[in-house]
């Protein structure tokens, strides 16, 4: 068969398996995790684009230089973050033993990509999906 047929077969196979490729792109994607890290550490916001509450005590806020928590002390929680795709959704968490305590204190919304960062997340995944497509279909 010809090149067009080969291309069509590869294209159809890729589109048929698109969910598998998307999951592979999302799983442990550091660029996506960095969006969550940035919104926590730099913007002090949750996955709902809300400031993290409760606020720090006045004494600790004075020491940190801001009153809204950033959940960054040693960086261990940020380093231990992971992202995993599950169908049409993904889950972000951290494997540090105190992550559940932080979720109890500040809400499970500390993990996730906020609406204000969704466009960037989409761009990250779309760009990588395009690279995968070129690699697989045009090879």
Model-assigned labels for residue ranges:
Residues 1-139:
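Short, Lys/Arg-rich flexible segments
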